[in-house]
Regions:
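Walker B catalytic motif
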Residues: 322-325
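Phosphate-coordinating catalytic segments in nucleotide- and nucleic-acid-processing enzymes
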Residues: 31-304, 310, 315, 400-437
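Phosphate-binding P-loop
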Residues: 1-4, 285-286, 311-316, 343-347
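Pre-Walker A-like glycine/lysine-rich segment at the N-terminus of P-loop NTPase domains
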Residues: 1-52
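C-terminal lobe/lid and adjacent interdomain/linker elements of RecA-like ASCE P-loop ATPase modules
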Residues: 336-437
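Post-Walker A helix-loop "phosphate-sensing" segment adjacent to the P-loop in P-loop NTPases
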Residues: 26-38, 315-316, 345-346, 372-373
Length: 437
C-alpha cells in the first residue's frame, strides 16, 4: 500500500480496513514490548489480537505473517562499518526498507524466520538456517561497493534469532569485526515507530474539570483522554496556520479550528483557582452566548477536540493514525475537518493515515485537490476495502489531477441515487393508487 501525505481508507463494515492500522500499531507495540524474546506482541495497550492463530488468515497455522515497509528518510543515513577510515562504508542513502516474516507453527511459539534491512542499494539479512530453527546466518548484498561481513577470528559460533522481529541479537555485533552499524539500522526503525501516534474511534466523555499534574504527555491518549493535558502542556508554545502567517498561542490554534468547523465561537481552558491544578474547558457556541463547560454543549465538540489537538501537538514529520475522526460531527463539520487534515499534512508535514466513513470529508478533500492551491492529487492516496467473499480486498482509487475518482467502486458511499429513485417510484405508486380509489 502506497501512502501519501494523506491516506484515506474507506469501505464497508467488517471489510478489514481497520486491520491496516492495527498492523502498524502491532509493530509499534512489539517495539515497545519488554519481552525481548517475543516475535509479535499481539496483546497490549494498543491492540489486542489474541493468539497467533486468531491473527492469521482463516486461523491457518501453516501460514506465515510477512511484511515489507519502505520510507524516505528526511536526511541521508550513512552507515559506518568501523572506526578505520579505510573500511568500506556498508551503505548510505535516503531510501530505507525493512522486511520480516514470522511463523506460528513452532513448538515454542511464534518465531521470526528472517529480518532484512535495506538502505540505498544494500541489504543486510539475518535468516534462519535450513537445519536448525535456532541458528541464523547474517549476510549482506550490495550493488555499490561489495561490502561483506568479516568474522572475528576463532570458533564460528552460531547466531541466535532476531529480537522482537526487528532487532539483531548481540552476537551479530560481537561475532563480526564490522557490524556495529546494525545498531543504526535498528535505531532508524525505532525512530519511525516512536513517531507513530494513534487516536481511536471511541473517545472519552468530556469532564466538568480536569486534574493536570503539570507534566507533558506524549500524545492525547488513544481515547483522547489526555487532550486537555496536551493543550495545557503546550499553552506557552506558538503555531502558525500557514507559511508566513502570524504565530498564535497553541490554544488559539485549537480554538481557530473548532470555529472553522462551525462548532464554537470561542474556546479556552482555565484554572478553577490559583494553584488548584484543576482546570475547566469552556466554550461559547455563538457570539453573545453564555460561556459554558465542554460537558454542557454538543457531544461532537469533545469528540473532535482530540483530533485537532493531536494533529497540532505531535512533532512535525510525525505519522498520525486516525479511526473515524469525523464521528459525532454533522455533515458541514465533517467537510471542514478535511481542511484540518490538509493543514496538518501540508504545513506541519504530518503524515496522516485515516479510516473513515464520511462522504462529506471525502468530497471536501476532492474539492481541495481540484482547486490545487492547498493540496494536490499527488499528495493523496485513497483506498477502498471490501470483502465480497469473506476475504479482504484493497483497491487503490485512481485520482486524476482534479481530484476525480476514475474507478469509483459500486456502492462506495452507499447508493444515494438509488434511494432517490426508489423513493420517487414509491411516491408515484402511492399517488396513482390514491387517485384510483
Amino acid at each position: 500500500m502506497d501512502c501519501g501525505r494523506i491516506t484515506g481508507i474507506f469501505g464497508t463494515n467488517s471489510s478489514g480496513k481497520t486491520s491496516l492500522l492495527q498492523f502498524l500499531l502491532l509493530l509499534k507495540q512489539t517495539k515497545d514490548a519488554t519481552d525481548r524474546a517475543t516475535s509479535l506482541e499481539l496483546t497490549g495497550n494498543l491492540v489486542e489480537l489474541g493468539t497467533f492463530a486468531d491473527a492469521i488468515h482463516r486461523h491457518d497455522m501453516t501460514r506465515n505473517i510477512s511484511w515489507n515497509i519502505e520510507f524516505s528518510l528526511e536526511k541521508s543515513l550513512e552507515l559506518k562499518a568501523a572506526s578505520s577510515e579505510k573500511s568500506i562504508a556498508p551503505a548510505s542513502g535516503n531510501n530505507f526498507g525493512f522486511s520480516a516474516e514470522v511463523s506460528g507453527n513452532s513448538k515454542s511459539g511464534p518465531i521470526t524466520n528472517y529480518i532484512e534491512y535495506r538502505l540505498g542499494n544494500a541489504a543486510f539479512k539475518l535468516e534462519k538456517t535450513e537445519k536448525n530453527d535456532s541458528n541464523f546466518n547474517l549476510d549482506s548484498t550490495s550493488t555499490d561497493n561489495g561490502f561483506r561481513f568479516i568474522r572475528n577470528q576463532g570458533r564460528v559460533w552460531p547466531i541466535p534469532g532476531p529480537i522482537k522481529s526487528y532487532a539483531f541479537p548481540d552476537q551479530a555485533r560481537t561475532f563480526f569485526q564490522n557490524s556495529a552499524f546494525l545498531a543504526d539500522l535498528e535505531k532508524t526503525y525505532e525512530n519511525l515507530f516512536d513517531n507513530v501516534y494513534y487516536l481511536g474511534p471511541l473517545r472519552d466523555y468530556p469532564k466538568r474539570d480536569y486534574l493536570w499534574a503539570r507534566t507533558r504527555p506524549t500524545d492525547v491518549g488513544y481515547k483522547g483522554e489526555r487532550a486537555i493535558d496536551a493543550i495545557l502542556a503546550a499553552r506557552d508554545e506558538t503555531r502558525n496556520l500557514a507559511k508566513g502567517s502570524r504565530n498564535k498561542p497553541f490554544e488559539s490554534i485549537i480554538a481557530h479550528w473548532l470555529k472553522e468547523l462551525g462548532l464554537i465561537d470561542s474556546f479556552k481552558v482555565e484554572e478553577i483557582a490559583p494553584n488548584s491544578n484543576r482546570w475547566q474547558a469552556k466554550v461559547r457556541t455563538k457570539a453573545g452566548a453564555a460561556e459554558v463547560l465542554l460537558t454542557d454543549v454538543g457531544f461532537g465538540i469533545s469528540q473532535v477536540l482530540p483530533v485537532i489537538t493531536l494533529l497540532q501537538y505531535v512533532p512535525e514529520g510525525s505519522i498520525v493514525l486516525l479511526e473515524q475522526p469525523e464521528i459525532h460531527l454533522h455533515p458541514l463539520a465533517q467537510s471542514a475537518l478535511a481542511d484540518v487534515l490538509i493543514q496538518a499534512a501540508m504545513h506541519r508535514k504530518v503524515q496522516i493515515i485515516l479510516e473513515s466513513h464520511s462522504e462529506h470529508l471525502l468530497a471536501r478533500l476532492q474539492r481541495r485537490m481540484a482547486e490545487g492551491d492547498k493540496i494536490s492529487a499527488e499528495d493523496v492516496r485513497l483506498y477502498f476495502c471490501d470483502a465480497p467473499k469473506g476475504e479482504s480486498q484493497l483497491t487503490k482509487l485512481q485520482i486524476d489531477l482534479f481530484g476525480k475518482i476514475g474507478n469509483w467502486p459500486e456502492n462506495f458511499m452507499g447508493d444515494a441515487f438509488g434511494e432517490i429513485a426508489a423513493a420517487e417510484k414509491a411516491r408515484l405508486k402511492r399517488m396513482i393508487s390514491s387517485k384510483s380509489q
